[in-house]
Amino acid sequence: MDSYIALTLFGCFFVLVFIGVPISFSIGIATVASMLLMFPWDIAAITVSQRLANGLDNFALLAIPFFIFAGTLMNSGGIAIRLINLAQVMVGRVPGSLGHVNVLANMMFGSISGSAVAAAAAVGGTLNPIQTKEGYDPAFSTAVNVSSCITGLLIPPSNVLIVFSLTAGGVSVASLFMAGYLPGILMGLAVMIVCGIIAKRRGYPLSEKATFAQACKAFLDALPSLLLVFIVMGGILGGIFTAAEASAIAVVYTFILSVLIYREVKWRDLPKLILESVVTTSIVLLLIGFSVGMSWAMTNADIPYMISDALMGISDNPLVILLLINIVLLIVGIFMDMTPA
C-alpha cells in the first residue's frame, strides 16, 4: 500500500508540474490525492487543512515577509546602484570587469536583502544594458547574473536558510547563517574565475580606473547599505534579537535609507511595493504550508524510511549519502524552486 501512496504522491506531482500547474498547487493536489488513499475524503480534507495551518504556525516565519519587504524596498531605493558603483571600483581593472561587478553586486545585495530574485532583478536590470553597450554578449551577461544571484540564498540573511531551519526540526538559524558565508563566497569566487577566463578569451573591455576620490565616494555612498549586514548579523549572533526581530529591524533601516535619506522611494510608491511584497510572501508561505502537508503525508506512508533504506543499501558512508542527496536536489532543483525542494 505504501508503494501505491508514494507512486500517487510523486506521480501526480510531476504530472501536474509538467502540464504547467503552479508548484504550490501541484504539491497540494498531490498531497490530497495521496491522503485519499489513506483516509476517507472528509478526513483527508480536514487533515490537509490542519497540516497547512500548523506548517505556518511558527514565529520564525515572520522573518520571511519582513525580509521580502526589505528586499523590495532595496530594489527600488537606490541601494543596488550604490553597491554596483562600489563593486566597479573594486574590480574595474580585471578582465571582464562588468561581469565581476555583476557577481560582487549580487553577493552584496543578496547578503543584504536575503533574496536571490530581488538581487537578480536589481543588479541585472541595471547592469545588463550597460554590458550590452560595452560589447558584452547578452547571453553571457544573463548567465553571469543568474549564476551569481543565487549566492544570496547562502550569504545571510537568507529566507531559504530560515525555511530549512523550520523543516529540519528547529536547527539554529544563527548557526545556519554562519555556515552560509563560506560556501556563498566560494560560489561567487568560482563564478568570477569562469567569468574572467571567458572575458579574456573574448576580449571584453576593462572599465576605467577609478581615482582615490572616486573610490572613497563609492565606499561612503555604499557604507550605510553595508551596515545593515553588521546590524542584522551582529544582533542575531550576539543574542540581542532573533531572526524574526532582525527582519523587522531590516525593514525599518531600509525604509529610513530608501525613503528618508536617499529619497529614491516616494510615499506614493509604498502601497505598490507593499502589494508586491504581499504577493511574493503569499507564494512562499503557500509553498511552505503545502510542503509541510506533503512531508506529513510522506511520513505517514513511511516514504522517508523507504528512501533511507534505499540509500543505506547503496552505501553507509555519510559522505556518499550526502553526495546522493545533493544529486537528488540538483535534479529536483531543475524543475522547482529552492523553497519547495
Please report, for each region that a protein language model flagged, where it lies by residue.
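Alpha-helical transmembrane segments of multi-pass membrane transport proteins
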Residues: 1-341
